[in-house]
Amino acid sequence: LFIKRVDTIEFARKNKLSVQVAARDLRYQWFEELRIKHGFDGVATAHHLDDQVGTFLINLARGTGISGLHGIPVKNGHIIRPMLFASRQEIVDYSRENDLPFVEDSSNIYDKYTRNRIRHHVIPQLEKINPSFREGLNDTILNIRDAEIIYKHAIEMARNSIVIVRENQAIIKLVDLLNLNPLNTYAYELLSPY
C-alpha cells in the first residue's frame, strides 16, 4: 500500500486547474513515479462502470466531439482499468462477500463536484426510465469507440490525399477538400493540427 499526501489546492491554484483536475493530474504523476521506481509494467486503477457512465454524461453535458464520448479507456499507456465492466455496487458486494476492504475517495459524497451530482441525481433518474441504463450506456460507449476508429481512419485517408506537407508548410488541395462531406467536420479535423 502506497500513500502520499499532497497540497492539491495549491497545485490547482498555481496551474490554474480545478481541484478535481489537479487531483487527477497529481494522482497519475505519482502513479508513474511509483511504476518507474518499483519497475512495474503498469498500474491498475479501480475505475468502474459508474465512473465510465459518469464520465460520458459529463462530457455529453459539456459538449464534445466523438473522442469525448468514447469514455474511459481500458488501457492508456501504462494505466489499465480492469474493473470498468463492474458497477460500484457489484464491487462493494464482492468485497463484503469475500471480506476484502473497500476504500472510497471521501470526495465522492459531496454534491459540489459535477461528477457526484451526476452520480447522485442524474443517473438514478435515468435508471427510472431504464433500470439497465448503465449497462446499456456502456454498450453505446463501446459502439462509439468502434465508430471513432472508423472516423479516425476516414480522416487519415482524407489527410493523406488532400494535405501535402513540405518542409514547414502544409498545402491543402482546396478543390478536393470542398468535395468532402460533411465539409465542416473534415475541414476541422484536417486543419486543426496546423
Where are the language model's segments positioned?
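Core alpha/beta nucleotide-donor-binding catalytic domains of modification enzymes
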Residues: L1-P124
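AMP-forming adenylation/ATP pyrophosphatase catalytic core
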Residues: V6, L26, K75, N138-Y194
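Alpha-helical structural context
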Residues: L34-K37, I129, Y194
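Alpha-helix boundary/capping and short turn/kink residues
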Residues: R62, I66, R88, E127-P131, ...
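Short, structured loop/turn "capping" segments at alpha-beta junctions
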Residues: P101-V103, S132-L137, Y151
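Internal, active-site/partner-interface "lid" segment
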Residues: N108-N116, R134-R145
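Conserved anion/nucleotide-ligand pocket segment
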Residues: R119-L137
